[in-house]
């Protein structure tokens, strides 16, 4: 005998609606709607930011939208956006842009547990930004054009007339500007102005570091002032290089150490997850992701580069920390004064 369902049709429809709603709430799409997604303003090299975001999402399930731009451009954008900024974390190729944001009170304090794994000299004095990886300023030279023994003892000596047409530099480079600030800190503003004036008079200006390095490699110029990792990046493209690296010693400004840096914004809508991303960047896994992509030094205590770099402990940089470099405005002013900017 067939049993007829005597419930009103409206009850049946209500039950069906509730069931379907329950299934919808259990679906992956419903979960993804509630999932946190971070926005990273990336002033570092594109490949580094992309690989970092991919590894962090694989580790935590948190998606990272990466917006690429120059470090200074992104820092200016954060200032302009204020509390409306969509950025949660900003990652820069150098520290001055973050010093600038910190001075304006736009950065959040970084968790102490994250800062504790990094050397004190490479974090912001207020604990609101951190160095992520390090690189050193070097001279790339072509031994077919000049012997290493004939290179100057100090980077300041490149400003002399004997270097006419023999030294290249990139005045728009953030690291070059940091080097100018280091000279101000070590030797005074007048010495830095003389150095920039001499380079302008006798050196060759290049548009970016890789163009400058390739000029040495191709024998167009004997030496260029660059960061060490550009040479290793070129080595990936061309196994046998014609150029070599020279490291300044005895605390000379030519051996300045600069750092890529990161910070969380006070305006972040996801402060907990932003701190997670910073912690990942300082973790052993995060540091390895970055240094496997770009030949930089890991800053996490106890870690060493596996890219064949000169050991970090053997570098002899000047006693100028990233925090000492401030926002690099002094260098930009000097460059304008001598006609380089």
Task: State each model region's role.
Residues 15-27:
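Bacterial N-terminal signal peptides
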Residues 33-99, 341:
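Early extracytoplasmic/lumenal segment of secretory-pathway proteins
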Residues 296-341:
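An extracytoplasmic/periplasmic, membrane-proximal ligand-sensing/linker region
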Residues 43-47, 69, 73, 85-221, ...:
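Extracytoplasmic ligand-binding site segments that recognize negatively charged/polar headgroups
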Residues 96-100, 222-243:
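A ligand-binding cleft/hinge motif common to bilobed small-molecule-binding domains
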């Amino acid at each position: 005998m067939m049993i007829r369902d005597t419930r009103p049709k409206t009850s049946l429809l209500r039950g069906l609606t509730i069931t379907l709603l329950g299934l919808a709430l259990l679906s992956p799409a419903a979960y993804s709607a509630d999932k946190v997604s971070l926005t990273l303003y990336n002033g570092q090299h594109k490949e580094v930011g992309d690989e970092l975001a991919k590894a962090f999402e694989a580790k935590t399930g948190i998606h990272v939208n990466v917006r690429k731009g120059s470090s200074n451009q992104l820092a200016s954008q954060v200032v302009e956006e204020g509390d409306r900024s969509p950025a949660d974390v900003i990652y820069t190729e150098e520290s001055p842009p973050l010093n600038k944001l910190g001075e304006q009170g736009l950065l959040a304090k970084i968790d102490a547990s994250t800062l504790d794994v990094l050397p004190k000299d490479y974090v912001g004095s207020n604990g609101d930004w951190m160095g992520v990886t390090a690189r050193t300023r070097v001279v790339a030279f072509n031994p077919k054009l000049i012997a290493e023994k004939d290179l100057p003892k100090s980077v300041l000596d490149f400003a002399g007339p004997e270097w006419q047409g023999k030294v290249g530099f990139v005045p728009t480079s953030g690291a070059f500007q940091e080097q100018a600030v280091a000279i101000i800190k070590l030797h005074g503003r007048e010495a830095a102005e003389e150095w920039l004036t001499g380079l302008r008079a006798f050196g060759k200006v290049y548009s970016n570091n890789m163009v400058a390095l390739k000029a040495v490699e191709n024998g167009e110029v004997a030496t260029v002032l660059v960061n060490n990792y550009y040479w290793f990046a070129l080595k990936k493209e061309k196994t046998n290089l014609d150029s070599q690296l020279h490291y300044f010693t005895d605390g000379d400004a030519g051996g300045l150490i600069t750092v890529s840096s990161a910070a969380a914004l006070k305006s972040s809508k996801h402060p907990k997850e932003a701190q997670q991303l910073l912690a990942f960047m300082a973790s052993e896994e995060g540091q390895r992701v970055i240094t496997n992509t770009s030949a930089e030094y890991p800053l996490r205590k106890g870690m060493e580069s596996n890219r064949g770099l000169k050991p970090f402990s053997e570098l002899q940089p000047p006693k100028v920390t990233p925090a000492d470099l401030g926002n690099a405005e002094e260098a930009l002013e000097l460059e304008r004064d001598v006609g380089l900017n």
